[in-house]
């Protein structure tokens, strides 16, 4: 639980959760689900996590569970080239240009922040776009997946005793030997060190592309020496090696090649990966054969961070997972992530790039475009090397056959007013026109006109909203918690939570309270809470309007807001309605008094009295 600002030791905000439950290591505080397709379910979940030290934190998760279906399949996608990064929405736009519509998506590979080049393999449309030795996730045409080490190896047979090991579409260093580039990388290599380059083209009519378990014959058609950024042919490949490489024999082998010479490029992979159509590299294996892994290599493994992971369950269904480390969500360590993926039923699970890279996107049924589902750690989504999407064929929408309510779930208190949006989709979940005869109703709610409902006073359990239109029906359920985790109190129209309150005697102050439940903002009205003040301070009504007692001296006490077993108490001081001895009857008296009690100015004290000198020249002492 966060500690609010304290202006002084005496001004302590007291927040009490009476009879608060003892939470396990991870306990689900609540969740809402939404079907994105026949076999794809989106779950927004809130967990209460207890660390090894006993600290309780909130965790907000976005989980997409997918079972194989004809209309939706997983794919890997990146920007126009491997070099550089791409925003999720721009990558989605590229998919749309290819005739696909995003159902949901998460970020994929770890990558070099300076170049955007992903670590590990990348496969799209059954074509190997980049090599690598990292663990990976691969998807087959039927929507199934494989996780593990793909053991992808690219070799070059140049007629020597031993074929050369090749790094495919990676940045050149003096340590990584022979490289092979295609225009998937970019139009140029953009390397920062000089190298020796050999231009090759496939023999016959073969395309300049590599596939798993493939052998490709190429012909030497040119050489380029002592160049950092060398052009990559559109219809071929570029072999390269650093001039200062530690692999001198490999450099000599490339330098020995002559025009017209025939070379063989061979790609091999582990059994079970031959038919993978999309893949991207990842990091540590989190769950293997149903058991949680504990030996991690990631440098931030023990840090609480935003995380992205993917897993395969015993029945073959897939789990796409993200958790936030922003706002009111603390993130997970890698060990906690492994335990969470196991708890979600994963037989095998793989860690993907996290932290500021963590991203979750979703197209809510009834909407024509996608939205960001998670809260990014950097305040906005980071451009990444690649993404994993669930996609369907894009097509014109038919007649509405499904109705949706948004928000599709959440938390509310009695008396709250909830604004809702009604959307419609056809049988393929494509956005469709909403029938015009929309009616709102439900359980523990009352239609409040237009697109609003009001939660009934005294409602318990859940408020269920129902929308009907054109013979279709949709529901959204809002849990009514018995207690809250925090109730910040603010001035009406202000955003800063109060840690104490000081007002003038006889003044009226409009206050508002907001309920929070494990980091989730709860729909509420001021009448959802019980307001009370110490008798000596004045009165407060059900809407949070505080009327202070008339007094010529400071009176102290407390103001308390309560919901269920949760209360928030502010220390309150009611002072004189005329704090300054020299402002009575002055034209600016009320303004000066208001600023004084707002803490904006303080005046000066003399002989036990407070003076403002309203007509004197302004000095710095007037302002705090």
Question: Predicted segment positions?
Answer:
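Extracellular/luminal low-complexity segments enriched in Ser/Thr/Pro
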Residues: 449-463, 542-557, 612-614
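Extracytoplasmic Gram-positive cell-surface binding/anchoring modules and repeats
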Residues: 551, 575-624
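Low-complexity "stalk/linker" and mucin-like segments enriched in Ser/Thr/Pro/Ala/Gly
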Residues: 431, 441-453, 496-498, 524, ...
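Edge beta-strands of extracellular beta-sandwich domains
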Residues: 472-482, 567-575
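Zymogen propeptides
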Residues: 25-232, 237-239
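Conserved, well-ordered active-site substructure
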Residues: 113-141, 279-346, 357-402, 406
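Beta-strand-rich structural segments
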Residues: 415-430, 465, 507-520, 559
């Amino acid at each position: 639980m966060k500690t609010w600002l304290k202006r002084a030791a005496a001004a302590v905000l007291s927040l009490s959760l009476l009879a608060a439950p003892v939470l396990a290591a991870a306990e689900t505080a609540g969740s809402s689900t939404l079907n994105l397709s026949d076999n794809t379910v989106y779950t927004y979940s809130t967990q209460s996590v207890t660390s090894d030290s006993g600290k309780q934190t909130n965790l907000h998760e976005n989980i997409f569970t997918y079972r194989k279906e004809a209309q939706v399949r997983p794919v890997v996608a990146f920007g126009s080239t491997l070099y550089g990064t791409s925003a999720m929405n721009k990558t989605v736009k590229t998919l749309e240009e290819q005739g696909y519509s995003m159902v949901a998506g998460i970020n994929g590979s770890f990558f070099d922040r300076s170049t955007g080049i992903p670590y590990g393999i990348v496969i799209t449309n059954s074509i190997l776009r980049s090599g690598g030795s990292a663990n990976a996730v691969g998807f087959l045409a039927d929507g199934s997946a494989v996780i593990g080490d793909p053991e992808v190896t690219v070799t070059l047979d140049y007629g020597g005793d031993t074929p050369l090991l090749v790094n495919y579409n990676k940045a050149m260093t003096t340590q990584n030997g022979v490289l092979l580039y295609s225009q998937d990388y970019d139009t140029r290599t953009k390397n920062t060190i000089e190298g020796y380059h050999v231009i090759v083209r496939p023999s016959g009519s073969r395309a300049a592309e590599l596939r798993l378990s493939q052998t490709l014959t190429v012909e030497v058609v040119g050489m380029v020496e002592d160049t950092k950024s060398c052009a990559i042919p559109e219809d071929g490949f570029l072999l390269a090696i650093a001039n200062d490489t530690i692999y001198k024999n490999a450099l000599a082998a490339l330098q020995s090649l002559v025009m017209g010479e025939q070379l063989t490029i061979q790609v091999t992979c582990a059994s079970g990966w031959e038919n993978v159509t999309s893949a991207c590299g990842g990091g540590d294996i989190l769950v293997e054969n149903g058991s949680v892994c504990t030996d991690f290599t990631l440098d931030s493994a023990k840090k609480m961070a935003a995380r992205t992971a993917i897993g395969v369950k015993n029945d073959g269904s897939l789990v796409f997972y993200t958790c936030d480390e922003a706002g009111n969500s603390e993130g997970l360590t890698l060990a906690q992530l492994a335990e969470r993926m196991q708890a979600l039923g994963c037989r095998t699970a793989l860690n993907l790039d996290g932290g500021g890279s963590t991203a979750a996107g979703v197209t809510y049924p009834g909407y024509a475009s996608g939205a960001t589902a998670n809260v990014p750690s950097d305040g906005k989504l980071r451009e990444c090397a690649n993404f994993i999407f669930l996609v369907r064929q894009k097509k014109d929408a038919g007649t509405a056959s499904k109705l949706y309510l948004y928000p599709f779930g959440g938390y509310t208190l009695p008396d709250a007013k909830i604004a809702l949006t009604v959307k419609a989709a056809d049988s393929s979940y494509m956005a469709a026109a909403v029938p015009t005869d929309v009616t709102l109703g439900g359980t523990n709610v009352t239609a409040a006109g237009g697109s609003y409902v009001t939660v009934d006073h005294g409602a318990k359990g859940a408020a269920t909203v129902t929308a009907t239109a054109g013979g279709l029906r949709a529901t959204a359920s809002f849990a009514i918690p018995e207690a809250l985790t925090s109730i910040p109190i603010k001035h009406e129209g202000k955003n800063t939570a109060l840690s104490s309150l000081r007002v003038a005697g006889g003044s009226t102050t409009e206050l508002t309270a907001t309920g929070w439940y494990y980091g989730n903002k709860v729909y509420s009205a001021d009448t959802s809470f019980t307001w009370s003040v110490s008798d000596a301070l004045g009165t407060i009504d059900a809407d949070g309007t505080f009327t202070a007692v008339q007094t010529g001296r400071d009176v102290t006490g407390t103001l308390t807001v309560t919901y269920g077993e949760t209360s928030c108490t502010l220390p309150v001081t009611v002072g004189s309605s005329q704090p300054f001895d020299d402002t009575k009857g002055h034209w600016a008296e009320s303004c000066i008094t208001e600023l004084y009690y707002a803490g904006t100015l303080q005046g000066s004290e003399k002989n036990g009295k407070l003076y403002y000198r309203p007509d004197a020249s302004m000095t710095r002492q007037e302002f705090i």
